[in-house]
Amino acid sequence: ALSLAFFTYNKGLPLTIRSAFFPFIKDRSWGWFGHLIDVVAVLATIFGLATSLGFGAQQAAGGLKFLFDIPNTINTQIAIIIGVTAVAIVSVVRGLDGGVKVLSNINMVLAVILLAFVIIVGQGLTIFSGLLNTSGAYLENLIPLSNWIGREDDKFFHGWTVFYWAWWISWSPFVGMFIARVSKGRTVREFIIAVLLVPTLVTILWMTAFGGSGLDQVKADVGQLANGISDVSLALFQMLENLPMATVTSFIGIVLVLVFFVTSSDSGSLVIDSITAGGKLDAPVPQRIFWATMEGLIAGALLFGGGADALGALQAAAITVGLPFTLVLLAMCIALYMGLKHEERFVLNSGK
């Protein structure tokens, strides 16, 4: 995001992935090599979003099963994907301010309400104590758990660590471009605080509150979680079941999951639309609709084609498109360093 924002707003280049490679390949950024970079970014984004949409459909279907006893089948999950995609299409047609911003604000309010509820109703002191412990443990184990040297949990490493890295990387073109698009006029310091520090702290708080509450229930042998997680998509709702107003909070949880994936789909469609339009922000509406529809179709195809191993199909898709894009990210980091050093020399020379 910082690399894209720098080369777009400071150097006057189009808001697209290829612009970050200008220090390396100069005018060839607008040739076949630049096209290849953007194609890889589009593939990573669309499969990353489709993977997320598939997981979201599984969790939402699990919530519907939990609340209303609606069977958690592939057909239910496909129906959820169709509904999410339809709302996302309406949102992308309305644009950034009319659709994406409104849904994002709704999502943020619901998330704050649910988080505050879990902290207040749950064991607040235990949660905040766990916040300090888990933060320290995270920093202590960040490097050891980031590589495979000396590890005995190969299955976990490949099924979780590698998968989530690949999944996050596949999101990077979409998230990076979207953040760059809304960050015009910010300083690098403001950017780092808003994009790195604040989300990290909020994520740690969220994971500590929900994960800590679930672990407390397991240790106290309370509820279904104490018997082990038989279905990952039900874990959130099984934890909320042991708190007051379980029906209301579970319903909010389902809505939160759905709205989150709607905002991901519509904002991702806008980003893909911008990439394929050469950085233009006002591409034709039918093009936006096409990309939003493609995300839903790919997510549905992965779930339907994966059958009983739908989760494995989603993971394979994320890893396949995410890992190659790692090279692009590393190159963008180097390009940003080169661009900032050039800017520093320019400022110093201008001062003289």
Residue spans for each PLM region:
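Extracellular loop-to-transmembrane helix junctions
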Residues: 1-9, 246-253, 315-331
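Loop-to-transmembrane-helix entry motif
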Residues: 106-107, 243, 279, 317-321
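Membrane-embedded translocation segments of transport machinery
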Residues: 29-189, 193, 198-251, 256-258, ...
